[in-house]
């Protein structure tokens, strides 16, 4: 009985410490100005990639290095990323090459996959993603809705919870979402530092979101 009570007390104490740590991480933190910011970009397939690359294309060279994360079977997004970065390098006369990297992770959920089984594939994707995010240690994560962004953002949040590094998470809801959030958006609403919507109807429903009009 004493052992059980001791274990229960230890578990309770650990839970309290984790909650306190999580609360501290989710609070606002001032960002120290720097010459460059390491950027991790999550690109989904199809329209998600087109939107996020339009946004990345408008960013200055100060966001460097740029690390792109895609699903392991997404060859189309890989080609679009390479094309964007090649065009950036050709248009930038101040540098001979552009500093970017492409990484692949397992999909969180395949098309038509059951919700129950997707829980396990998402956990596996998080297990795979955390070492990657820990190695990169980006200053900022930028994503816009694909399921692939969930394990990356959870991993980025864990870096802060563990006291390794505070990573700013910026989520941009897809332009296709006019009145309701995507599933990824509903999850990242609670985890992101900045949640950007592109329609006033969503801004009304989620007052703490940031509305800048159509940005992609």
Swiss-Prot record:
Membrane topology term: Single-pass membrane protein
Gene Ontology terms, MF aspect: protein-membrane adaptor activity
First and last residue of the signal peptide: none
Membrane topology, Lumenal segments: 1-3
Keywords: Endoplasmic reticulum, Membrane, Transmembrane, Transmembrane helix
InterPro entries, per the entry: Oligosacch_biosynth_Alg14
Origin superkingdom: Eukaryota
Cross-referenced Pfam families: Alg14
Principal subcellular localization: endoplasmic reticulum
GO biological process: dolichol-linked oligosaccharide biosynthetic process; protein N-linked glycosylation
Transmembrane segments: 4-24
Compartment(s): Endoplasmic reticulum membrane
UniProt keyword Transmembrane helix, yes or no: yes
Function per UniProt: Part of the UDP-N-acetylglucosamine transferase complex that operates in the biosynthetic pathway of dolichol-linked oligosaccharides, the glycan precursors employed in protein asparagine (N)-glycosylation. The assembly of dolichol-linked oligosaccharides begins on the cytosolic side of the endoplasmic reticulum membrane and finishes in its lumen. The sequential addition of sugars to dolichol pyrophosphate produces dolichol-linked oligosaccharides containing fourteen sugars, including two GlcNAcs, nine mannoses and three glucoses.
Subunit structure: Forms with ALG13 the active heterodimeric UDP-N-acetylglucosamine transferase complex.
Name of the featured protein: UDP-N-acetylglucosamine transferase subunit ALG14
């Amino acid at each position: 009985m004493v052992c059980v009570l001791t274990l229960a007390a230890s578990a309770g104490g650990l839970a309290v410490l984790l909650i306190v740590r999580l609360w501290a991480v989710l609070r606002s933190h001032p960002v120290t100005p720097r010459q460059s910011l390491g950027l991790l970009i999550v690109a989904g397939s199809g329209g998600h990639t087109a939107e996020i690359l339009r946004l990345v294309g408008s960013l200055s060279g100060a966001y460097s290095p740029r690390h792109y994360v895609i699903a392991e079977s997404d060859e189309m997004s890989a080609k679009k990323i390479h094309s964007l970065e090649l065009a950036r390098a050709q248009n930038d006369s101040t540098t001979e090459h552009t500093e970017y990297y492409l990484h692949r992770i397992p999909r969180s959920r395949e098309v038509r996959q059951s919700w129950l089984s997707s829980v396990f594939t998402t956990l596996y994707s998080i297990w795979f993603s955390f070492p990657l995010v820990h190695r990169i240690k980006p200053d900022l994560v930028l994503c816009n809705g694909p399921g692939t962004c969930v394990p990356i953002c959870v991993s980025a949040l864990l870096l802060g919870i563990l006291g390794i590094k505070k990573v700013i998470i910026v989520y941009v809801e897809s332009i296709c979402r006019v009145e309701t959030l995507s599933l990824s958006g509903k999850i990242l609403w609670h985890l992101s530092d900045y949640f950007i919507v592109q329609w006033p109807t969503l801004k009304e429903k989620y007052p703490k979101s940031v509305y800048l009009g159509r940005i992609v």
